[in-house]
Amino acid sequence: MTALAFPTASSDNLMTTDRTKELNDRVVHVLSDFTQWLARYGEVSRDHQTFFAGTTGRAAKRLYYDSKLLGTAAVAPMIFLEAFLPSARRFFHHPTRFPIADAHYAMGFAFLYQATGDLSQLENAIHFLTELKKSRCHQFKEYCWGYPFDWVTRNGVLKEQTPLITTTPYVYEAFLQVFRLDPRDEWKLTLESIAQHASIDIKDFKTSEKSSSCSYTPYDKGGVINAAAYRSFLLTSASLLFSNDNYWKIAERNLNFVLENQNPDGSWFYAVDGVRDFVDHYHTCFVMKALAKIHALTGHPATLKALGKGVGYYLGNLFDADGLPMPFSRAPRLTVYKRELYDCAECINLCLLLRDRFPMLGTTLEKVVAHVLQAWVKRDGSFRSRKLYLGWDNVPMHRWGQSQMFRSLAFYLSEGSKRGAQRPMFQDRMPS
């Protein structure tokens, strides 16, 4: 495998450049090993929700929301297993294909194609788009995606194949990224259908003269911050792609909802219902990633101001003493883990999106990438899922960290190639 080559550096920047080159070389090897693992392991997996996806787990979780005392006793065995025997997931639900993971894999392979010029990586990306067209929610006219299991929430059960505005935008991004590399009419038609779904099937709820929250599914009453952020980004992008001003009008109201509900310290609660007022790492990243993309597309000044406050809160409250991502700054309940692969993946994504506007994130980016390569890569090529208080959760879960980290590192490699590195040789390919 050919190492990445960087342009000649000045003496002042030589040490940083050498470190970056070494990190890029390691990323190439890790991604190569991961694609081989993925080919062996397959594209279905268990999930962080597996304990509660089957009949027993769903009943226990529903009881927890209905009766705290009885419910706590009911879910306690699953929480114990999650903390001390994660492999017990296999007794609770079968391996499943997750659309959100397929979307991340599609984007990851598209980034590898951009970084390497290897056409087989684009073919891998298209493979996952093909799977996504199969897994759409077929009861809806327009293209949309949800979870492949019944999800018990505080507000009721979201049935399998209920469209989620926190999943569909990732699929939109995957199709958009591949469309820009391989501009087929079928990709554009799919993108147009997704935008129609997001604008029509997902509902708006006025919260002020200038803002509206949106529903999480076609059926709820809204109020979740990251849902509005996701939808605002999708429709902002679609408004430009399809020259549709109506999409921007909807997107702008959702954007204003997100901006108006930023806390004075720069954080965002999960929701505005007065109940789900926790602040965690990856949901914070979800919101800020959407804002970063909207600002990149529009130059919206208020969005940049909110991002500045958000970055300040993020760096000051969602990293531990070692400078690594921690799950919560304001937790909703007792947690059974110290660190999460998902948090690291979203941190890398966010830093890559924002380091041009907030250079201090460049240092965070390099630190977290180095940490992931040193501590989270398993011998088989996959990633650890969680750092528990005792040991690790090593169950590979495509939706819960594997696909997100693959995409993040591929994004990192692609961005490195844009910054002057020669294209790496990436010879390991998934079999067809």
Positions of the model-derived regions?
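Glycan-recognition and catalytic cores of secretory/periplasmic carbohydrate-active enzymes
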Residues: T2-S432
